[in-house]
Amino acid sequence: MQKKFLLLISMLLLVAACQEKEALKPPPSKNYSQTATSQQEDFLYDLSISKPTFTEGKSIKITAKLTYVGQAQNVTIYHGGSPFLFNLQETTRNFEIPSVMDTPLITRILERNVPYEEVYTSGGVYDEFSEPKLVEFMKQTMKGHFPKGHYIVKGSTDFYTEDPNEQKTEYKPSATIEFNVQ
């Protein structure tokens, strides 16, 4: 009986010790990264936001840049309506704001070390089967108004190049940033 009692006390101390460590974890940082960069071969992709926290109703500027850093003076890339995709997730409500892309093939020449830049334009999608909260949320984001919440921006590029033998090389560098709307 005494062994069982000691075992029970030991288990309680172990559980209490684990809970104590859990309580000491710092809260998640509210200083979100304003810039993220990734490189795939001769291409740098930068995703940035003007500041980490915004007031509801104020404009939010999210920028993507693609820079060719190779040896040639320039390179031709091929992509859809834009080489950039901006997929957003609002984590408070768990809503996704997907990137929608036109599908024409566009040819663009990038000069070495000169960034090509685009700014995120508001988006959102819903249909007649979407829940009313999602519809209202998307209507606001489509007008460029982000409701209060925490947002994760998963930015990426999607393009390819061709060599003189018409061999395609695909590129899809990506980066992630976050921001809050209060």
Locate predicted features.
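Extended, well-structured beta-strand/loop surface patches
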Residues: 80-182
